[in-house]
Design a protein with these regions (language model features):
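Short, small/polar-rich loop/turn modules that mediate ligand/substrate recognition or access, typified
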Residues: 85, 169, 174, 230-232
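Alpha-helical segment proximal to the catalytic Tyr-Lys
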Residues: 124-125, 166-170, 228
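Residue(s) in the substrate-gating loop at a strand-loop-helix junction
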Residues: 137
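Short C-terminal tail/terminal secondary-structure segment
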Residues: 142, 220, 231-244
Length: 244
């Protein structure tokens, strides 16, 4: 399929996990992709895997100057932008009673503030037919021990899409949320640990964690015109975890 032929996409958190899987799928479907992340070594490795239709920009979504550099690079090489996949996120476990201000700041700076400015700074390059995809989480609608800051940040992301769909009326730009469940990424392994991964996998009707490529496939659908009448929607790709 070439559903994204000629399209330009930005994927934050694009060097590993869901972001890398989405970048691979976007390129397979014809897109030119800019991946954005904090670790230069991981970015370089990702570009080596993705090939000539990928570029890497190092930076953090919590840094506005870094985001400015990202979009300056997009404008200089491609001129316009068709797809933004605001995928960068962090998550760690701290139970109520142990939560710190630093924990809240790190979580919300990346997952909420970072998402807001990733999208806002992209808008001048986007036009009719553009697609914005926000990474939510099954944790945004369900409770999980010691994950209150992360869960709250992802619930906020869900409602950003609702509000932005109103703000973007008349522009032809769509905004939707892709909410994965337990996925075998580096972030999940770090946040959940081995036992936590087993617990989450056992809670899904499919009795397993997702492969990042399965999430990337849905991101490609939301990026393409196949989802042209979708905005303000949340697509759960969670093995049924948050649906029962």
């Amino acid at each position: 399929m070439n559903r994204l032929n000629g399209k330009t996409a930005v994927i934050t958190g694009g060097a590993t996990g869901i972001g890398l899987a989405a970048a691979r799928r976007f390129i397979e479907e014809g897109a030119f992709v800019f991946i954005f992340g904090r670790r230069q070594e991981a970015l370089a490795a990702a570009v080596a895997k993705l090939g000539p239709s990928a570029r890497a920009v190092e930076g953090s979504v919590s840094s506005l100057p870094d985001l400015d550099r990202l979009y300056a690079a997009v404008k200089a090489e491609r001129g316009t932008l068709d797809v933004v996949f605001a995928n960068a996120g962090v998550g760690s476990q701290l139970a109520l009673g142990k939560i710190t201000a630093e924990h809240i700041d790190e979580t919300f700076d990346t997952n909420v503030k970072g998402t807001i400015f990733t999208v806002q700074k992209a808008l001048p390059l986007m036009g009719k037919g553009g697609s914005i995809i926000l990474t939510g989480s099954s944790a945004g609608t369900t409770g999980a021990p010691a994950m209150s800051a992360y869960s709250a940040s992802k619930a906020a992301v869900r409602n950003l899409a609702r509000t932005w769909a109103e703000d973007l009326k008349g522009t032809g730009i769509r905004v939707n949320v892709l909410s994965p469940g337990p996925t075998a990424t580096e972030l999940a392994k770090e946040a959940l640990g081995e036992e936590g991964q087993k617990v989450f996998a056992s809670r899904t009707p499919l009795q397993r964690m997702a492969d990042p490529a399965e999430i990337g496939a849905v991101a490609a659908f939301l990026a393409s015109s196949d989802s042209s009448f979708m905005t303000a929607s949340e697509v759960a790709v969670d093995g049924g975890l948050a649906q029962l």
